[in-house]
Amino acid sequence: PKEVVYKKSSYDQSMINFSPPRKIYSPIIGVDLVRTGKDEFYVLEDNCRTPSGVSYMLENREIMMKMFPDLFHTNRVLRVDDYPTRLLQTLMSLAPKKCDSSIPTVVLLTPGHLNSAYYEHTFLSDQMGIEMVESQDLFVENDLLYMKTVDGPKKIDVVYRRIDDEFLDPLCFN
């Protein structure tokens, strides 16, 4: 019901009629499913804003495959170990068309080590081979986003934001 949507704190009326670049609204979504029967599933949570938990699934699968290899082979369980590669490909596909190089610079923006999903942030950035940055590592110059590095500023093409909306504004310390 629309009343439920309108009462949500994350509902932003200014987004009505907003058209994002290339009409890509949500390139990454997390959906938690619960199997309740042979052919019955329920959505426990769907998260478009900051999905998390995939690193635990990947680590769990790796351990389970080592412990029970026959179980996976016999039941033809699909592999998931290519998730970081596919995630990186998705992120790179979001780079602006006027990218300076053929390989876009992608970073993962984390709120820091106190965040409950920090392990996942480090895991994913490591698996994708990208830099993990915090807000203090970034600056804007001539309408372009840069990260500070030991070799000097490096332009960023894509930010994989793992930080909630309310923590984005550095002037509003929530």
Region spans (language model):
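Domain-scale recognition of functional cores that engage charged ligands
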Residues: 1-174
